[in-house]
From Swiss-Prot:
Gene3D superfamilies cross-referenced by the UniProt entry: 4.10.1060.50, Phosphatidylinositol 3-kinase Catalytic Subunit, Chain A, domain 1
Organism: Trypanosoma cruzi
Note: Ubiquitin is synthesized as a polyubiquitin precursor with 5 or 6 exact head to tail repeats. Some ubiquitin genes contain a single copy of ubiquitin fused to a ribosomal protein.
Key word Ribonucleoprotein present: yes
Family annotation (InterPro entries): Ribosomal_eL40_dom (IPR001975), Ribosomal_eL40_sf (IPR038587), Ribosomal_zn-bd (IPR011332), Ubiquitin-like_dom (IPR000626), Ubiquitin-like_domsf (IPR029071), Ubiquitin_CS (IPR019954), Ubiquitin_dom (IPR019956), Ubiquitin_ubiquitin-like (IPR050158)
Glycyl lysine isopeptide (Lys-Gly) (interchain with G-Cter in ubiquitin) crosslink site(s): 48
Transmembrane annotation, as ranges: none
GO biological process, one term: translation
Gene of this entry: FUS1
Molecular functions (GO terms): structural constituent of ribosome
Record-annotated Ubiquitin-like domain positions: 1-76
Protein name: Ubiquitin-ribosomal protein eL40 fusion protein
Record's keyword annotation contains Chloroplast: no
Domain of life of the native organism: Eukaryota
Amino acid sequence: MQIFVKTLTGKTIALEVESSDTIENVKAKIQDKEGIPPDQQRLIFAGKQLEDGRTLADYNIQKESTLHLVLRLRGGVMEPTLEALAKKYNWEKKVCRRCYARLPVRASNCRKKACGHCSNLRMKKKLR
């Protein structure tokens, strides 16, 4: 049977499949046609993300059905160099206990007039 896969760019791909094919097989066929690795593909049908181990029949996908292909988003990890930079500019600071002004680590007095340039400073609390 023939099914269609629609990408986010609007391109529609026709695939020849069987209802007993797994989602992994469909992703492999998409890789053959489009060159997108299966681990980056997410297939959506009827508002549900399709799981790799299941078959087309499990999701009641019939001939001429349309699946939607979206790419998996990666993220959540900060590079060590960026993390060090963030620490340098955001975390390693002193804070005035009276006016809460952020100050450099080497500061001994506050720079603000509002608190009278007091020397009552503390280190900024670390994020967890």
